[in-house]
Amino acid sequence: MIKHFINLDDLPNHDLTQIIKQAIALKKQYKSGKINKILEHKTLAMIFDKSSTRTRVSFEAGMTQLGGHALFLSDKDIQLGRGEPIIDSAIVISSMVDVIMMRISSHKDIHTFAENSSVPIINALSDESHPCQLLSDMMTYQEHNGSIANKTIAWIGDGNNMCHTYMQAAKSFNFKLNIATPKNYQPDQDFIEKYANHIHLFTDAQKACQKVDLVVTDVWASMGQEAEQTKRKITFKDFSVNAALMSKAKPSAVFMHCLPAHRGEEVSTNVIDGSQSLVWLEAENRLHVQKALLLYLLN
């Protein structure tokens, strides 16, 4: 049976934990200068309809480090961007490569692609979730503070795809999640109902951050929402992660952001560049955790 990675909780906790464990080992191996060509002669197709820095660089570099090859396919490069049916593209592309990574707008389209693919599909970001980023976040927390189980995390800002994936992670990794959003910017109702036992909803960021172990945020306007930027700056002004907000968390608390960040909006400069911030380690770990994910999916 083909294994896909479309949502974080597609995989059992044991498998997610093993992927992170292997990622830490691969990172140590890479830092020591050891060469591992375990994916030699394997090809990863990377399909994008969104611009990307961390996703493209981490997957492409990761395949190279493991001896494989990564093929970049934007919607301008392939017939999928000119109206070829998703089913047809899935059948053809999967017949020529070993694994496919997709960073596209429609989560539904990723599912359709997976249903018609003969190789594993990785969701590298959709309008619904961002599971690869969460693997990196969980790895980063474990490296810095140990197990995240039974900890309390505060999500501050928009109830977007990253927030959805943190809700999935709360169940998979057994932590409590406080979600603070403006009134009309909560996560999708389906997610609220599905993960109700693992989350608490707030409209006050300071209350959500009380005594938490980790504070996480994301941009106020995601790609495709640029027209709402000015309105959202006003609506979200009380949901900026600054030093005053971080002071509500535990003294040992850390800060994460999937990047890119807008300093002075969702996070202040002194927080993202401060001693509690793990954003650079978090970004670097995308490389190693995705290498471990590729090895898992390719067995």
Swiss-Prot record:
Keywords carried by this UniProt record: Amino-acid biosynthesis, Arginine biosynthesis, Cytoplasm, Transferase
Residue positions binding carbamoyl phosphate: 52-55, 79, 103, 130-133, 258-259, 286
Pathway(s) of this molecule: Amino-acid biosynthesis; L-arginine biosynthesis; L-arginine from L-ornithine and carbamoyl phosphate: step 1/3
Subcellular location: Cytoplasm
Residues where L-ornithine binds: 161, 218, 222-223
Main location, first listed in the record: cytoplasm
Role summary: Reversibly catalyzes the transfer of the carbamoyl group from carbamoyl phosphate (CP) to the N(epsilon) atom of ornithine (ORN) to produce L-citrulline.
Record-given protein name: Ornithine carbamoyltransferase
Source organism: Ruthia magnifica subsp. Calyptogena magnifica
